[in-house]
Amino acid sequence: LAFIFLAAFTVIIYYTSTKRGSNIGFTTSISLVITFMLGIFVGFGWRTEAIFLGVLISIILFSKERMHQLVSRLNQKEIGDLLEFLVLLGIIYPLLPSSFELFGVNVQPLMIWGIIVMISVLNFCVFMGARYLPIQHKVELFGFLGGLINTQAIIGSLMNVYKQNKKMFQNVASGFILINTAMYLRNFILITIIAPLTLLYVGIPLVLVLATLIPFSRLFLMMKHREAQIRIDSPFGVWAAAKLGLAILLVFIILDFSRSLGGNALLITAVLGGLVYSLAVCVSLGTLALNNVITAQQAALAFILANAASVISNFFVLYVTGGKDMISKVSKAMFISVVVSILGVFLSIIAFGLS
């Protein structure tokens, strides 16, 4: 309860100091939250976490000026969303049990929390990087970076650019291909960090996908290049974190249940899940593989199929947002990428063996 009051107090301090032009700003607000968390962690006996946070707060205070330069590209709402997001993570962490049973499935909330933090760090790096991009090839680069955060949302943004200027066809087509490239790369990074053994089976498919999509994207750019403004919205916020956590939990339970059914139920479920939210599917597959609930080979095959399903979903988004004439131009590249990824995972399973 005390932490909730402190969090509210911190947010109020930040907003009021921003309006008044006071020196109390982002780093001070973050430091207040983290310092209070140090006491909570020590009280719970989490001394390692307390030491880590102590070092972190020292770095934040030491690099205060650089931090101000970093967040200078963010508006007040975006910084407020980030603060609320950090506060939410801090409130939830001490309350989470290490594991519990739900519908006969062993759920590990702390692991899900850690995955959300990992994804958030990736999103933050991409989000900040996008603010410092040069103007050259901005549509294509924003397509790639946006694909790392929210695939379907950035497709909608690209199509808005296309609707405003039909001459941007080549740029938007290249951007769509790069969005899917980024999606493959993001999901690959997440599943291999969570379950490193899957690297043996998803590494070759990723290389084949990159070798297919990047040249096609470059080909569109060589035809004609134009510039346009596009913006990536903040990926932070209480609702975004809650939605991600609930999605991972739900998909994890469904995948674990489908595995118990035997046959191809796991693969079918991964495909259906990939049509909706491939990130949650890939994270859940990695978690199941890490806990030896499924093998690395099963996780890899389901991972590739989920990504293939997500490509289909992206085509649907492209269609409904007004990109009917673009589908025929980019379908060849995407079809080849799906085929080579599936061939790649089977070759990997043959090469590295079954278990």
Segments from the language model and where they lie:
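Structural signature of hydrophobic alpha-helical transmembrane segments
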Residues: 1-7, 45-58, 107-118, 143-148, ...
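Cytoplasmic-side transmembrane-helix entry/capping segments in multi-pass membrane proteins
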Residues: 2-5, 20-33, 51-55, 74-84, ...
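Transmembrane helix-loop junctions at the membrane interface of multipass transporters and ion channels
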Residues: 38-45, 95-106, 177-200, 317-323
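Membrane-interfacial helix-loop connectors
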Residues: 145-150, 156-165, 169, 175-182, ...
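C-terminal ends of transmembrane helices
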Residues: 7-24, 61-74, 125-134, 155-165, ...
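Selected transmembrane alpha-helices and immediately adjacent juxtamembrane segments
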Residues: 77, 82-139, 222-274, 343, ...
